[in-house]
Structure formats: C-alpha cells, structure tokens
C-alpha cells in the first residue's frame, strides 16, 4: 500500500505503508544509530514524535522484547529507507511490521531518508503527517501541521503509581518523567533499592520516605511545559539529598534553579555523540536523545552551577555541577541502551555521593 510523508514546509515523500494504516501528525526527528531501533521505539522520550532512522536497513535482527526500554512503544510513527521483513537472529520473537501493527503505530518505508535528514538539518525539526490517503489536500493539511504541538507529554508517559525495586544498598527515589528501564536497572544492579515515583509526586512525599539519593529521569517534550514539576524539583534542590539528573531531568533542574533552556535546530539523537568532561579533559562517546539544551552560561554567571560536560561537535552544554550541593546533571544517557556505555561510571559517582559502594573507574 502506498503511503506519504508530508512535511509542514510542503515536501512530500512517497513510499510504502508499514505498520498501522491510520493517519498521524507528529514532530519529525531523525536518529543516527545503526542499531537499537527497538530501544528507540520504546523510549518514552520519543512520545509525540515520528522517528526517521538514518541507517538504510532497519529490522534485520528482529524484535527482542527483553530489550524494550519501557512497557510499550511511544513513538507516533516510524520512518525507514528499507525494512527487513525476514529477520535473522536467534533472540528474535517478532518483526517490526507486526510490532507496529500490534501497537497501532503507522510508518513509511522506501523513502529517501538521507534527503529527509538533510531537510531537517538545514531547516530544523518540523511537524509532518504520515498518511495512506492518496487524495491528500496540502492546502488543508499544512495549516494543521503548523498548529500541532506535543503538549504536556510527561504526564502521558509517567508511571501511574509508586513502584519499588528491592535492594540492600542506598535508597534511591527515581522521579519518572518517562524513565528508560535501564536507568532503574543501572541503579538496582549496584544494589540500590529504587522507588519509582509518578512525575507529579510532591517533593514532600518523596523526602518523607527519606531517600539516600534522588534521580531525575529522562522524558519527552518541552521542559518549560512542566511547570508543576519544576516547582517540586526546586524543593528537592533545597534539601541536602544528593541528586543525579539525566536528559529532561537535567533541563528541569536548570529551570528550577533560575536557569533557562531553548529548543535546538534539530537536536541530538543517536549513539555516537562525543562529550568532553571539563574536569578531566577526557572525551566519551555517548547516547543522546534531546531537542532542548540548557543555557549553561546563565547558571554559571549566577554562581548556581558550572558546566561539567560539553558536546565536542557543537559546543552545547552536556552537564552541570551545582555549587555547594551534591548535585550533578547530564544531558546525555549514561545508561545507554542503545549506545555506548562509556559514561556508566557516573552511576558509580552517584553511589559514592550517597555513601554506597564505590565502583567508579580510577
């Protein structure tokens, strides 16, 4: 069946329908990872977005459910150059085609993903529609695309009730703004007892449980939409509890302490982004998925925090260390999945802050 990807600037890509045949409007983004497509599809940070995979062949190792980063896929749509319909992998239990159909997610294959990526890089991230309607009307569709916003998606992807992962080590409160599964796993495998809280949980409730440390997770959308959450994070900042924040959590901590964020032209999404540790000078290859960035200069001028990591490619901020506080935040994903685990030592640094076992690299 024919399918069409229509961008808000009027570009139309013709391809073949994969997955569901329903029509969808979403933000169109691209990911440069060669593998890890299941982890991408099930990453809650992609809620409200259709993802274009830049690698030309996707699906050749099938679907392995134990690799999911959450209970279900959160992408709005999936865009590939070529979809492998016959995977070869002893772990595979499903195909992308059936996986997308099962979860009612539309997609398109057979388009020039390189051309699409170049458009998004040159013009910036934009909204688009995936449709199988051959009689589409651009004059009717384009105003709808320009009016689309993702809204407050954190409340959509967060857990609905508190959950506890047992452990004999430090007690960690994980605020779930759309947390990838491997964040909790990375803490739990280090012995931590991890309590996962819904995103709108009041700070008083979290602090009443007397955690040894607080983790602010990744998540989707514009951080400035999370006004209620920002107020609660401000209260957590004022406590003496060690805090480690990742991705959206990094942005929310900056906003909670008087900093600012802004939308990037096309964001960082992939498993090959080099970041530099400004304290040691070492460079790590990181997994990233974000479309917003923290204004580090503003926080530094106020004496609230100083930059800890920068992106080697474009110089944007990748982490902050907060003055006089046991708080550090990073924009990238030390838990990886998919991607390199170069920076997993940051979980050990967090353990050390909480007084737990020090497994940090020397």
What would you call each of these model-derived segments?
Residues 1-204, 208-209, 223, 337, ...:
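RNA-binding accessory domains that recognize and position tRNA/RNA substrates
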Residues 213, 218-285, 296, 339-355:
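Cysteine-nucleophile active-site neighborhood
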């Amino acid at each position: 069946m024919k399918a069409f990807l229509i961008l808000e600037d009027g570009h139309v890509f013709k391809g073949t329908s994969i997955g569901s045949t329903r029509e969808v409007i979403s933000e169109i983004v691209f990911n440069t990872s060669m593998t890890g497509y299941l982890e991408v599809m099930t990453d809650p940070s992609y809620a409200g977005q259709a993802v274009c995979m830049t690698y030309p062949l996707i699906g050749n190792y099938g679907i392995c459910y134990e690799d999911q980063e959450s209970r279900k896929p959160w992408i709005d749509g999936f865009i590939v150059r070529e979809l492998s319909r016959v995977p070869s992998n002893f772990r595979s239990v499903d195909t992308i085609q059936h996986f997308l159909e099962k979860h009612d997610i539309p997609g398109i294959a057979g388009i020039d993903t390189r051309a699409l990526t170049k458009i998004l890089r040159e013009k910036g991230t934009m909204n688009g529609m995936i449709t199988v309607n051959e009689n589409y009307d651009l004059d009717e569709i384009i105003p709808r695309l320009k009016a689309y916003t993702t809204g407050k998606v954190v409340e959509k992807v967060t857990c609905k009730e508190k959950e506890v992962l047992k452990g004999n080590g430090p007690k960690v409160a994980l605020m779930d703004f759309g947390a990838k599964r491997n964040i909790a796993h990375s803490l739990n495998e280090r012995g931590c007892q991890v309590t996962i809280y819904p995103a709108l949980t009041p700070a008083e409730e979290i602090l009443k449980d007397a955690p040894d440390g607080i983790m602010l997770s990744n998540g989707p959308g514009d951080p400035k939409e999370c006004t209620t959450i920002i107020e609660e994070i401000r209260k957590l900042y004022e406590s003496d509890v060690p805090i480690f924040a990742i991705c959206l959590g990094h942005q929310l901590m900056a906003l909670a302490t008087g900093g600012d964020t802004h939308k990037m032209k096309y964001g960082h999404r992939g498993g090959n982004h080099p970041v530099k540790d400004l304290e040691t000078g070492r460079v790590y290859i990181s997994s990233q998925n974000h479309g917003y960035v923290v204004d580090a200069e503003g926080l530094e001028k106020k004496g609230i925090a100083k930059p800890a990591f920068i992106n080697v490619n474009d110089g944007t901020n990748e982490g902050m260390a907060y003055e006089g506080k046991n708080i550090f935040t990073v924009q990238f994903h030390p838990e990886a999945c998919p991607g390199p685990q170069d920076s997993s030592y940051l979980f050990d640094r967090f353990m050390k802050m909480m007084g737990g076992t020090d497994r940090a690299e020397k």
